[in-house]
């Protein structure tokens, strides 16, 4: 096979060389009948052309025939070759050339093997060609296009040492799946199911009597039987399956919810283990990782959240558990062994569900557990901190951040004053870094509420909070900058005048940049801060310090901004400063005009100096080195 390939390549080289020596005599090449490579002098182009064409056609037939024969016997000998492949190391190297007159042999694979000693011999189990006819076997190539332009193409089932590596052109012409698309432009994969339920094998239920139809002494036993019925898990991915039994389970859940809500004196100590078991079997299940996150793909907001098909049963199970926790007869001291850390960890993992309805009921459930089980409070806060830290620094994929922050806001509201050092560390290490994520818009209202609660509890934290917000202030994300400006206004509602002095200079430097923004909504939101009376009063008390910082941006915006509405608002803010202290304002305007004049003079001098340098450079003759 190697000999036939070398003949075939040499014939191609002969054809190429003959094309490069038209209308002249030169040293020519031909292949004799015995296959030897012969050089002759002064052979005419026409004779050599016909002979090389004939040899090329003949060698093409030999080559294709050999390939077809090997394709037939390749699978039959695959078992024998498996034992040989353990000792054989085959490396294929393809060298490509971009010139038309290059040697075609550079495209051939280089075979390195420890067992094939003579490279001119055929590989083991490779059949030798018997005839030159290949026309009857051309149809055996269903997936390969054979043409005169692709003599070296081989079928997909050829040995690895005969398959050439793809060239850059082949990669370019390949399918779209081989194109290296940026990650931010790739479509976000959607998961089909938010969770996986362990469907019960026996799913046939019998309707039990209602609580009103039995004696009072038998209601507790009936309650337990209904709970056992509700332990059966149905397949809601098939809407047409077990319709009657699904309805029986839903009715049983509704009856138990009404029974717990309307009756007092229920022995919760004996029933609560059964309720926890039913809750665990129905609610706790694996949640798929969040794939449709909003960290990099803003267009993912158009995607509808996945709603749990089993929600008709899930909702009632949640409500039953919540009703039990809210029952006046419930005693948390007797349920500590049931609602423990492991139970809470499984409950916390469910906050990653994509269904907002379930996250809402999870939030209520966690509220009740935090209020009832005092021994778990520290562990609950620590576990929530871990979720936030993982979201910030690792994967930024978790659906329930907003709900957890809402729970945390009510927890912070109940903190005792003065705040513990643990809570201050949580503010600086967790809450403030939550501003840096790309998906902050999903939970920003809840985050702002937590920040405001901390400042309200301890005003001395104002400087640390505002410094952290300025640290993570967005530079190119206008939508995120609007959120930060809204948060600044909310913080001013609880800001102490004594604390404002410590942070006003860096804060107003950032406000000046926002006022100068070409995004009209950002500029408008920054200017509208002066519509807040408390904000304006704090500014008036420190106008001497703040006006020099903010005036250049206000002046440029009022005169140069592309939006006429923004220009009008900027003029109104300037008028507010005039009303605060007209004398200081007029003096500042004069100083600003003088500074502008000096700046223009400096620019004129600089321009003149550059003109002089250009004139001197034009007078100098170019040196030999520059030539």
Curated annotation (Swiss-Prot):
It is found in: Cytoplasm; Cell tip. GO terms for biological process: deactivation of mitotic spindle assembly checkpoint; meiotic sister chromatid cohesion; negative regulation of septation initiation signaling; signal transduction. One of its GO terms (cellular component) is cell tip. GO terms for molecular function: protein phosphatase activator activity. Keywords: Cytoplasm. It comes from the Eukaryota. Its main location: cytoplasm. Residues 1-37 are annotated as: Disordered. Pfam families: B56. Belongs to the phosphatase 2A regulatory subunit B family. The B regulatory subunit might modulate substrate selectivity and catalytic activity, and might also direct the localization of the catalytic enzyme to a particular subcellular compartment. Has a role in cell shape control and septum formation. PP2A consists of a common heterodimeric core enzyme, composed of a 36 kDa catalytic subunit (subunit C) and a 65 kDa constant regulatory subunit (PR65 or subunit A), that associates with a variety of regulatory subunits. Proteins that associate with the core dimer include three families of regulatory subunits B (the R2/B/PR55/B55, R3/B''/PR72/PR130/PR59 and R5/B'/B56 families), the 48 kDa variable regulatory subunit, viral proteins, and cell signaling molecules. This is Serine/threonine-protein phosphatase 2A 56 kDa regulatory subunit delta 2 isoform. It comes from Schizosaccharomyces pombe (strain 972 / ATCC 24843).
């Amino acid at each position: 096979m190697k000999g036939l390939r070398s003949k075939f390549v040499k014939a191609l080289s002969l054809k190429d060389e003959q094309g490069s020596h038209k209308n002249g005599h030169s040293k020519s090449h031909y292949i004799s009948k015995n296959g030897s490579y012969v050089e002759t002098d002064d052979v005419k182009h026409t004779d050599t052309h016909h002979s090389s064409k004939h040899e090329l056609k003949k060698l093409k037939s030999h080559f294709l025939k050999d390939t077809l024969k090997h394709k037939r016997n390749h699978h039959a000998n695959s078992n024998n070759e498996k034992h040989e492949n353990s000792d054989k190391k085959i490396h294929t190297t393809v060298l490509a050339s971009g010139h038309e007159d290059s040697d075609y042999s550079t495209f051939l694979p280089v075979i390195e093997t420890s067992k094939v000693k003579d490279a001119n011999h055929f590989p083991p189990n490779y059949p030798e060609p018997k005839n030159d006819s290949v026309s009857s076997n051309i149809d055996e190539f269903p997936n390969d296009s054979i043409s005169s332009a692709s003599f070296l193409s081989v079928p997909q089932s050829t040995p690895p040492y005969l398959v050439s590596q793809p060239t850059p052109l082949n990669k370019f012409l390949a399918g779209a799946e081989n194109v290296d698309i940026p990650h931010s432009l790739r479509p976000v994969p959607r998961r089909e199911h938010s969770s996986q339920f362990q469907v019960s094998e026996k799913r046939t239920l019998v309707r039990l009597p209602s609580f009103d139809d039995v004696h009072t002494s038998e209601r507790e036993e009936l309650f337990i039987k209904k709970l056992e019925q509700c332990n059966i898990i149905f397949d809601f991915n098939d809407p047409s399956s077990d319709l009657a039994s699904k309805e029986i389970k839903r009715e049983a859940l509704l009856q138990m919810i009404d029974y717990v809500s309307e009756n007092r004196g229920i022995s919760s100590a004996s029933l609560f283990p059964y309720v926890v078991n039913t809750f665990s079997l129905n609610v706790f299940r694996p949640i798929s990782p969040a794939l449709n996150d909003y960290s990099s793909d803003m267009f993912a907001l158009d995607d509808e959240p996945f709603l749990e098909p089993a929600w008709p049963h899930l909702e009632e199970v949640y409500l039953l558990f919540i009703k039990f926790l809210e029952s006046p007869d419930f005693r948390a001291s007797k349920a500590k062994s049931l609602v423990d850390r492991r139970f809470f960890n499984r409950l916390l993992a469910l906050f990653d569900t994509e269904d907002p309805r379930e996250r809402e009921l999870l939030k209520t459930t966690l509220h009740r557990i935090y209020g009832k089980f005092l021994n778990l409070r520290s562990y609950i806060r620590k576990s929530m901190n871990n979720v936030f830290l993982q979201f910030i620094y690792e994967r930024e994929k978790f659906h329930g951040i907003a709900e957890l922050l809402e729970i945390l806001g009510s927890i912070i509201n109940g903190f005792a004053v003065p705040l513990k050092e643990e809570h201050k560390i949580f503010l600086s290490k967790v809450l403030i870094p939550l501003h840096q994520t790309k998906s902050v818009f999903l939970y920003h209202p809840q985050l702002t509420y937590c920040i405001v609660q901390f400042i309200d509890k301890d005003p001395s934290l104002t400087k640390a909070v505002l410094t952290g917000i300025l640290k993570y202030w967005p530079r190119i994300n206008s939508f995120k900058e609007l959120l930060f400006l809204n948060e600044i206004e909310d913080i001013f509602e609880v800001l102490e005048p004594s604390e404002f002095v410590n942070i006003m200079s860096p804060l107003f430097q950032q406000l000046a940049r926002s006022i100068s923004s070409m995004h009209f909504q950002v500029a408008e939101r920054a200017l509208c801060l002066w519509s807040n009376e408390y904000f304006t009063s704090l500014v008036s008390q420190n106008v001497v310090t703040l006006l020099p910082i903010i005036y250049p941006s206000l002046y440029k915006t009022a005169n140069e901004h592309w939006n006429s509405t923004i220009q009008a608002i900027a003029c109104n803010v300037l008028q507010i400063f005039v009303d605060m202290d007209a004398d200081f304002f007029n003096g500042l305007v004069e100083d600003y005009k003088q500074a502008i004049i000096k700046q223009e003079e400096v620019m004129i001098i600089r321009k003149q100096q550059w003109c002089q340098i250009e004139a001197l450079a034009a007078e100098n003759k170019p040196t030999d080195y520059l030539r």
